[in-house]
């Protein structure tokens, strides 16, 4: 999964929970007010696209690590963290998201998902399976449908 950064401890990304937070690289939207605009491009600036579902970026863009390193970080924090928050960019844009959620669940961690909800069919698929269903979703509604082109750079429905 293409992740641009990791926060090993957060008390603010999931209300009432202590988590690690990962930021997915890439977002199909281009919101004018995006606070993570460096994560919009699917290839980090000055770097190549991250093709492997096992490869992620570490603490800095382009600092490659494997997804198992994220899981090692979580395993080392059993009893300290309640879960993993997956943010972005846009997590629903990654085909590896279901596997990442399932891996965190298999280790006993809850999963929170920050998403714009841009891909409702992908979100429905996650919700239909216990192994990939996030325990919490922070849904960031960008704008009313008639304002999406000016706010998010996309038209309603795509």
Language-model features: locations:
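Conserved AdoMet/S-adenosylmethionine-binding subsite of the radical SAM
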Residues: 71-83, 92-158
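A generic structural signal for ordered alpha-helices
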Residues: 5, 9-12, 62, 82, ...
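Conserved non-cysteine loop/helix-boundary elements of the Radical SAM core domain that shape
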Residues: 39-66, 90-95, 129, 148-158
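Hydrophobic packing within well-folded, soluble alpha/beta domains
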Residues: 27, 31-34, 104, 113
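N-terminal [4Fe-4S]-dependent radical SAM core
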Residues: 1-23, 32-59, 77-78
């Amino acid at each position: 999964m293409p992740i641009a950064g990791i926060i090993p401890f957060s008390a603010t990304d999931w209300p009432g929970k202590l988590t690690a937070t990962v930021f997915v690289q890439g977002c199909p939207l281009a919101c004018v007010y995006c606070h993570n605009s460096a994560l919009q491009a699917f290839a980090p600036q000055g770097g190549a696209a991250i093709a492997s579902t096992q490869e992620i970026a570490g603490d800095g863009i382009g600092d490659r690590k494997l997804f198992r390193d994220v899981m090692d970080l979580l395993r080392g924090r059993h009893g300290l963290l309640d879960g993993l928050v997956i943010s972005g960019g846009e997590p629903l844009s990654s085909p590896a998201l279901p596997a990442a959620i399932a891996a965190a669940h298999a280790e006993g961690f809850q999963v929170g998902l920050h998403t714009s909800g841009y891909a409702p069919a992908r979100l429905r698929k996650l919700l239909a399976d216990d192994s990939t269903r996030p325990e919490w979703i922070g849904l960031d509604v960008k704008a009313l449908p008639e304002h999406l082109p000016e706010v998010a750079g996309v038209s309603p429905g795509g």
